[in-house]
Structure formats: structure tokens, C-alpha cells
Amino acid sequence: MTVSSGDPDVHASRSAQLFERADLVIPGGVNSPVRAFHSVGGTPRFIREASGYTLTDVDGNDYVDLICSWGPMILGHAHPAVVEAVQTAATTGLSFGAPTEGEIELAEEIVRRVAPVEKVRLVNSGTEATMSAVRLARGFTGRTKVLKFSGCYHGHVDALLADAGSGLATFGLPTSPGVTGAQAEDTIVVPYNDLDAVAAAFAANEGQIACVITEAAAGNMGAVAPQPGFNEGLRTLTRDNGALLIMDEVMTGFRVSSAGWYGLDGVAGDLYTFGKVMSGGLPAAAFGGRADVMAHLAPAGPVYQAGTLSGNPVAVAAGLASLRAADQGVYDALERNSATLRTLLSDALTAASVPHRVQTAGTMLSVFFSEDPVTNYEEAKAAQTWRFPAFFHGLLSRGVYPPPSAFEAWFVSAAMDDTAFSIIADALPSAAKAAAAAVQP
């Protein structure tokens, strides 16, 4: 059954029951906050299965998926090559706690694709990757302070939750309770796309900043690309001040090109973090970079990092299969599909006289209800975000599943076809009208 009603929850009775049940044993009923529909209201959809571009919930509703598991599913769901790789790996053992050849192959694939990355360490999540990269940067430089950007999200690492995007943006929190003052004191936060602020921070903290960490292109305040020269400027400022540049490509890595954002702008970081696409949809991530920096990582060096399930053979098999299947044809399809979605969104919102900007960062995109370009977090928050819940439910109730937050990027998959875009095109006029009719609280 495909959703066709304008009522956001009319066909969600089983999801509602499961959400109530989940809330009894899981905080907030979900295992990652944005899934709770906190900023859009209504009942979170509990998913039964997925194939290609289609999600099917427990009530039997089908949706064109524009979340793609928050980025990993560039091939679409249940891609045969990935499923076969997982099944084959699982028959030989689920976890060994010892090295495997697959770990080497996955690391080699990452090194082959991203030239500045000379060595790689596999971990289980993007949060682990960024946490470990920052620790390594501190150990390598002997410095303590970290510079990050307002609205950029680097996982739920204590030191990096200050003024973050993603889930914290959804909840309107500048940071999280439980993050100590001492941790916050070592984190310097400046506006995204503002090189003058970065230069001023270095001047005010001379010899103290271990690293600058940035999303290679921001996706957790919505899709906000670096302005021309911004990443290049970060490279110059970090090099001139003896700090490392950490490029967080958990979101952009292997999605916006076969070499991630590095493949688009060619700016070489000292360290990189990866996740999502390289995981094939299973829990896996990585960090890597210059060989001389990575040489400080245990057991080769003194900076400790470890993980029981790091390099898990089933996750490694999924990631390797996903990367190997992502040939140029896949990236061409992602470009086409992103461009088509962008046009459909803008045409529908223009027809409904809704102020908007459909912004892209590579093949990621976001809808901002603003007439002005969004280049940083403050501008993202200044948009008419109160229009988003009506727009979201206008799409969801008609078989299209966008991210349930105005501050998250939208993702396409290579599996999307004319039928998928026909469903989107049919859903958009009423959703755009709902956004136009929304009333500011």
C-alpha cells in the first residue's frame, strides 16, 4: 500500500503502537534522537523492510526514501552485491577479535581513492572516528585545544558537541548536559565559512590549537558547501600555525565522488574521518591520514585506540562490496538524481510562492525556507524553519520520506528511477501548499 492521505498519521497505527512500546524500554522510544520526529511532530515510522529506493513501514506504507539511512545507501537498499557479500562473510564467522585479509582490502580501497590518506584505522562509528582523530592530533602536536565550526556535527564526542548541528540543532541546544566546563574550555567554536574568525582564533591561542576539524562540506546544519577558498584557507592557516587539519568526511566520503569531497576540491587534510558509505549500511567507520601522524597510533606509537569489534568481518565485507559496486555509473546517477530532485523541489515551492533556497553540497541537498543563501549555522537558524513540519508531513503522507528535521541533508540513491520521481512530483504540490499555509508560532 502506498500512502495517499493528507493526514500525517492516518496509516500509522502499528507504528504508533510500537513507539509506545519502545518508549517503555528505550529513552524517548528511539536509538538516535532525530528518529523521534521531535521537530516535526507525529508518529515515527517503524520500518519493516527496504529495497532499492523504497522503504516499507510496519503498517504496509511505501515511501520513496530520501534519507538513505542518513547517507550510506548510495546503491539503494538491499543491493544484491552487498547482500551476497554479507551472507558469504557471515557463514565463515561473525567476529574473530583477530586480523583478517578483508580489513587490509578495505583499507587499501580507501587509500587508493583518497590520495592524502596513507594509512587507515577501522572503527565502529563516525563518533569513534572523530574522537580518535582528535586524540591523535593532540598526541601528535602536544597541544590541547580544538577548533570547530558552529553547526558542524562530528558525532557525540564530548569535546565536539559545543554548538553542534544535526540532532542538537533539532533540539535547539547549544551543547549537551554532561559535557564538562573543562572539556568545553578546550573547544574553540567559530562561524562556518569565516576564515577571519579562524585566523583570529589562532592569534588568540598561539601555540595551543592542536587541530581544526571541519565537515569537508557541511551537512548537519542542512547542506552548506564551503565557500570558494574556504577549505584552501583552512589548509594554509593550519599549516602556518603548526596545527593539523581534520577533514570529517563521514557524510561526504565516497558519496559526492569516488574520492569524497577531496575528489571535488583537492584540498588535502592531515587526517580524515569516514563512515556511512564505506560501511555498506553496517556499523563501520575509519580514520586515516598522513603516515607520520598515523605512526603515533598504538601499537606503533603512544596514542591509544582500540575496539573489540573494529574491523568486524561482516561489516568489512559490506563496506568493501559497497565501494566496489560504486562505479562511475553510480556517481553519474547520483548527480542526475540530485539535480532532478532539486528542480522538482524548487519548481513546486516557486509555484506555491514559498520563499526558499534548495542548496546543494555535492549531491547532498537541503531545503531552506529563506530567500537568502545560507552559508553558516546562524543563517540556517534564521530561515523560516516553522514551515518545515507542514512540508515534511505533506510529503510523508503521500509516500515520500524526507529527513524529519530542517537541519539535515537530503540524500538520493542510484536506485531511484522515473517511478520514484513521479511519486515525488505528485506529492510536492500539496506539500508546498502546506508549507505556504504554515503559520509562524
UniProtKB/Swiss-Prot annotation:
The coenzyme or cofactor needed here is: pyridoxal 5'-phosphate
Instruction: Please name the pathway.
Output: Porphyrin-containing compound metabolism; protoporphyrin-IX biosynthesis; 5-aminolevulinate from L-glutamyl-tRNA(Glu): step 2/2
Q: Does the keyword Protein biosynthesis apply?
A: no
Show the InterPro entries listed in the entry: 4pyrrol_synth_GluAld_NH2Trfase, Aminotrans_3, Aminotrans_3_PPA_site, PyrdxlP-dep_Trfase, PyrdxlP-dep_Trfase_major, PyrdxlP-dep_Trfase_small
An annotated Gene Ontology molecular function: transaminase activity
**Cell compartments where the protein resides:** Cytoplasm
Q: Which residues carry this modification: N6-(pyridoxal phosphate)lysine?
A: K276
Q: Which reaction does it catalyse?
A: (S)-4-amino-5-oxopentanoate = 5-aminolevulinate
Q: In the Enzyme Commission scheme, what number(s) does this protein have? A: 5.4.3.8
Keyword vocabulary terms for this entry: Cytoplasm, Isomerase, Porphyrin biosynthesis, Pyridoxal phosphate
Instruction: Give any Pfam family that matches.
Output: Aminotran_3
Name the GO cellular-component terms: cytoplasm
Q: Where would you say this protein principally sits, based on its record?
A: cytoplasm
Q: How does this polypeptide assemble, per the annotation? A: Homodimer.
**HAMAP family, per this entry?**
HemL_aminotrans_3
The text of the family note is: Belongs to the class-III pyridoxal-phosphate-dependent aminotransferase family. HemL subfamily.
Q: Protein name, please?
A: Glutamate-1-semialdehyde 2,1-aminomutase
Q: Which organism is it from?
A: Rhodococcus opacus (strain B4)
Gene name of the record = hemL
